Amino acid sequence: MTSSTPTAPTAQAHGRFIRGSVSKVRRVLDQIRGRTYRDALIMLEFMPYRSTGPITKVLRSAVANAEHNLGLDPSSLVISSATADMGPSMKRYRPRAQGRAYQIKKQTCHISIAVAAQTDS
Protein backbone atom coordinates (compact mmCIF):
# COMPACT_ATOMS: atom_id res chain seq x y z
CA MET A 1 0.00 0.00 0.00
CA THR A 2 1.38 3.41 -0.93
CA SER A 3 0.83 6.57 1.05
CA SER A 4 -0.46 9.62 -0.76
CA THR A 5 0.83 12.26 1.65
CA PRO A 6 2.43 15.15 -0.21
CA THR A 7 6.13 15.56 0.44
CA ALA A 8 8.04 18.81 0.43
CA PRO A 9 10.20 19.35 -2.65
CA THR A 10 13.84 18.68 -1.89
CA ALA A 11 17.08 19.70 -3.54
CA GLN A 12 20.38 18.02 -2.88
CA ALA A 13 24.09 18.42 -3.50
CA HIS A 14 27.03 16.06 -3.22
CA GLY A 15 30.68 16.65 -2.47
CA ARG A 16 32.80 13.72 -3.51
CA PHE A 17 36.36 12.74 -2.59
CA ILE A 18 36.60 15.37 0.16
CA ARG A 19 39.83 15.04 2.13
CA GLY A 20 38.99 14.24 5.72
CA SER A 21 37.88 11.45 7.95
CA VAL A 22 34.24 10.32 7.83
CA SER A 23 33.91 10.41 11.62
CA LYS A 24 35.15 14.01 11.80
CA VAL A 25 32.75 15.12 9.07
CA ARG A 26 29.81 13.28 10.67
CA ARG A 27 30.53 15.05 13.96
CA VAL A 28 29.71 18.35 12.23
CA LEU A 29 26.80 17.07 10.11
CA ASP A 30 25.06 15.73 13.23
CA GLN A 31 25.03 19.28 14.62
CA ILE A 32 23.37 20.92 11.59
CA ARG A 33 20.88 18.22 10.55
CA GLY A 34 17.29 19.45 10.99
CA ARG A 35 18.25 23.13 11.35
CA THR A 36 17.30 26.02 9.10
CA TYR A 37 19.74 27.13 6.43
CA ARG A 38 20.53 30.39 8.23
CA ASP A 39 21.14 28.71 11.60
CA ALA A 40 23.35 26.08 9.98
CA LEU A 41 25.51 28.71 8.25
CA ILE A 42 26.01 30.58 11.52
CA MET A 43 26.93 27.36 13.33
CA LEU A 44 29.37 26.31 10.61
CA GLU A 45 31.06 29.71 10.62
CA PHE A 46 31.94 29.51 14.31
CA MET A 47 32.77 25.80 14.68
CA PRO A 48 36.50 25.13 15.20
CA TYR A 49 36.66 22.13 12.85
CA ARG A 50 38.50 21.93 9.51
CA SER A 51 35.67 20.00 7.86
CA THR A 52 33.27 22.96 8.09
CA GLY A 53 34.75 24.49 4.90
CA PRO A 54 33.74 21.70 2.49
CA ILE A 55 30.43 21.19 4.32
CA THR A 56 29.57 24.89 3.90
CA LYS A 57 30.40 24.64 0.20
CA VAL A 58 28.10 21.63 -0.30
CA LEU A 59 25.32 23.28 1.75
CA ARG A 60 25.48 26.46 -0.35
CA SER A 61 25.34 24.31 -3.50
CA ALA A 62 22.22 22.49 -2.26
CA VAL A 63 20.51 25.80 -1.48
CA ALA A 64 21.47 27.18 -4.91
CA ASN A 65 19.95 24.05 -6.49
CA ALA A 66 16.73 24.60 -4.53
CA GLU A 67 16.62 28.25 -5.54
CA HIS A 68 17.38 27.70 -9.23
CA ASN A 69 15.68 24.38 -9.97
CA LEU A 70 12.67 24.51 -7.63
CA GLY A 71 12.22 28.27 -7.11
CA LEU A 72 12.32 27.99 -3.31
CA ASP A 73 13.20 30.86 -0.98
CA PRO A 74 16.49 30.22 0.89
CA SER A 75 15.06 31.60 4.14
CA SER A 76 12.40 28.85 4.19
CA LEU A 77 14.79 25.92 3.77
CA VAL A 78 15.62 23.24 6.34
CA ILE A 79 18.38 20.65 6.14
CA SER A 80 16.33 17.48 5.75
CA SER A 81 19.23 15.06 5.44
CA ALA A 82 23.00 15.29 5.80
CA THR A 83 25.18 12.21 5.41
CA ALA A 84 28.85 11.36 5.03
CA ASP A 85 30.01 8.13 3.44
CA MET A 86 33.50 6.69 3.26
CA GLY A 87 35.52 7.34 0.11
CA PRO A 88 38.74 5.71 -1.05
CA SER A 89 41.89 6.08 1.04
CA MET A 90 45.11 7.30 -0.51
CA LYS A 91 48.02 5.19 0.71
CA ARG A 92 51.32 6.91 1.40
CA TYR A 93 54.49 5.72 3.12
CA ARG A 94 56.52 7.48 5.79
CA PRO A 95 60.19 6.52 6.23
CA ARG A 96 61.05 5.25 9.70
CA ALA A 97 64.18 4.13 11.51
CA GLN A 98 66.34 1.21 10.36
CA GLY A 99 64.97 1.13 6.82
CA ARG A 100 61.35 0.55 7.76
CA ALA A 101 58.34 2.36 6.33
CA TYR A 102 54.96 2.99 7.94
CA GLN A 103 51.81 3.20 5.87
CA ILE A 104 49.80 6.43 6.16
CA LYS A 105 46.16 6.38 5.03
CA LYS A 106 44.85 9.73 3.83
CA GLN A 107 41.10 9.27 4.11
CA THR A 108 38.44 10.80 1.89
CA CYS A 109 34.66 10.97 2.21
CA HIS A 110 31.55 11.78 0.20
CA ILE A 111 29.20 14.43 1.66
CA SER A 112 25.49 14.55 0.70
CA ILE A 113 23.16 17.31 1.90
CA ALA A 114 19.46 17.64 1.05
CA VAL A 115 17.36 20.72 1.83
CA ALA A 116 13.57 20.95 1.83
CA ALA A 117 11.01 23.68 2.27
CA GLN A 118 10.03 24.18 5.91
CA THR A 119 6.59 22.79 6.71
CA ASP A 120 4.39 24.48 9.30
CA SER A 121 3.40 21.58 11.53
From Swiss-Prot:
CDD domains cross-referenced by the UniProt entry: Ribosomal_L22 (cd00336)
Presence of keyword rRNA-binding: yes
Annotated PROSITE patterns: RIBOSOMAL_L22
Gene Ontology molecular function, alphabetical: rRNA binding; structural constituent of ribosome
Stored InterPro entries: Ribosomal_uL22 (IPR001063), Ribosomal_uL22_bac/chlpt-type (IPR005727), Ribosomal_uL22_bac/org-type (IPR047867), Ribosomal_uL22_CS (IPR018260), Ribosomal_uL22_sf (IPR036394)
GO terms under cellular component: cytosolic large ribosomal subunit
Keyword 4Fe-4S: no
Source organism superkingdom: Bacteria
One protein family per Pfam: Ribosomal_L22
GO BP terms in the entry: translation
Keywords per UniProt: Ribonucleoprotein, Ribosomal protein, RNA-binding, rRNA-binding
Family in the record: Belongs to the universal ribosomal protein uL22 family.
Quaternary assembly: Part of the 50S ribosomal subunit.
Function comment: This protein binds specifically to 23S rRNA; its binding is stimulated by other ribosomal proteins, e.g. L4, L17, and L20. It is important during the early stages of 50S assembly. It makes multiple contacts with different domains of the 23S rRNA in the assembled 50S subunit and ribosome. The globular domain of the protein is located near the polypeptide exit tunnel on the outside of the subunit, while an extended beta-hairpin is found that lines the wall of the exit tunnel in the center of the 70S ribosome.
Protein name: Large ribosomal subunit protein uL22
Species for this entry: Synechococcus sp. (strain CC9605)
Gene name tied to this protein: rplV
